[in-house]
Amino acid sequence: MHTLKQSAIESVGRRQLLQAGGIGLLSGFGIADAAQSRSSLKSRIVCVGGGITEIICALGYESSLVGVDTTSRYPLSVRHLPSVGYARHLSLEGVLALAPQQVIVGHDAGPLAVLSRLREASVLVSRVEDGQTLDALISRVKQIGQLLKCVGQAQALIQKLNVEWDALRQTLAIPAHTIRVMFVLGQTPSQMLVAGTDTGADAMLKHAGLQNAFSGFRGYRPVTAEAIIAAQPDLVVLTQPDALTPKNGLNSRSVIDQFTGLSATPAARPSRWLVFDTMYLLSFGPRLPDAILTLRRASIEAMRA
């Protein structure tokens, strides 16, 4: 990968140090006061991680974002921001070109060498902890609230999430028949992977009170027609980038033809296919309670069709 010349990195670093130092000096002499608008205190942020971007926006700091990664698709307005590319393959030049003061990344962001060079350029790089539970989500909100110095907004968001989660638990307490789900992660029509255990998809199914029909392996992988027939899924949940949420009755031969074994399972009916936006189900951001509830209700409704 082509890298910036050291002089260019140092130039960006010096400029950002002057910006940060200027704010500190003004505050030290009492010029900055409580009447100063919040927007003027915000720093330039690059965010890497769709769920993290959603939290930042939910806290009211969308205007601070100057760049996002390819998984940051919500709210829709962030799609117009400059992209720094795929989270695991960040470009040093691409990030520095946006002159960020903070880069907030998820657990899988990298390469590590790029993050280290950003720190050398005096950019504050913070890695947000991972997790697919409500507690993990709340921890992320707290951490980001501290990074952005908006603890009050973070606490308000946490309170909202707790209220939504309590309502969700009441819904999940209503008994329902066991529904065996084949969860398909679809990136392109030619790249369809089925979710096993230790995946975000498996966590979502458990949250929604659904059963993963492919619990015999870990991660995401292709499966054979024989494996599908043996699993006997009742329902297929397919995630696609920017799909409508939710949509059932998928009518795509290019997708169905990849899973010929489905014709010998209860999931053969078109009404037993549910299509969701990938990041809606798998970002584990502030929309988590709503996504779980929608997945459960859509699954139960599809089984009645």
What are these model-derived regions, one by one?
Residues 195-220, 240:
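His/Asp/Glu-enriched short active-site or ligand-binding loop at hydrolase and phosphoryl-transfer sites
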Residues 1-13, 23:
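N-terminal secretory signal peptides
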Residues 111-120, 237-256:
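A ligand-binding cleft/hinge motif common to bilobed small-molecule-binding domains
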Residues 102, 234-235:
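Short, Asp-centered acidic motifs that coordinate Mg2+ and/or phosphate
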Residues 44-113, 240, 244, 259-262:
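A short, structured surface patch at a secondary-structure boundary
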Residues 39-44, 102, 113-190, 211-216, ...:
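Extracytoplasmic substrate-binding proteins
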Residues 92-99, 224-232:
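Short helices/loops that flank or line small-molecule/ion binding pockets
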Residues 32-37:
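Boundary at the C-terminal end of the N-terminal hydrophobic targeting segment
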